[in-house]
Amino acid sequence: MQVTECRKAGQIGYAKRRMEDKMDILNKAKSGKKERPIKVVQFGEGNFLRGFVDYMIDIANEQGKFDGDIVLIKPIEFGNLDMFHKQDCQYTVSLRGNVNGEAKIINRIVTSVADAVDTYNEYDKYMGLAEIDTLRFVVSNTTEAGIVYDDTDKFELEPPKTFPGKLTKFLYHRFETFKGDMSKGLVMLPVELIDDNGIMLKKCVMQLIELWGLGD
């Protein structure tokens, strides 16, 4: 039985590799992606944000209601962004359900993501995003453990170790870049599954501002 199961597993694995070899890898040329201004930085690159927020922004772009792109930010040290760069950050969302009593599958190539940046291996590029004039929104889903104040976090770290630390330093750099211009402020859209996520994130940022002496 074990030999048979191993043989079947091997056959499945081989078939999967053959299928992957035959599949066309998406890229910006194949998806027909248009160049749009960067309006969103998104902390977190998981399925929920890509299948929900980024998907809706893609539709808004198509309808001419947003005209903006997203840069994904990897806020944690482990893992990599290879699978995103392999496809130029283009991917497919598949919706399956019933329409008027009939089963229906809708596949959509999402083109709203322009790039993906690693805060640890691409720190300068990450901080450079704060200098983008068209930037307007910050979306985050760093899990329920992401929004936390840590008084051992350091401004001098590149990057700071916590998500609020990374965000605070990012916002401070933007503040300095645009010399305090209030019109260059950013709208925060945290979707972490904790009560009062926006209030808690603001509290962490304000505590870090005080800890690091960034206020007036």
Q: What does each of the following model-derived ranges do?
A:
Residues 10-13:
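Residue-identity detector for glycine
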Residues 19-216:
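Non-transmembrane, aqueous-exposed alpha-helical and coiled segments at domain scale
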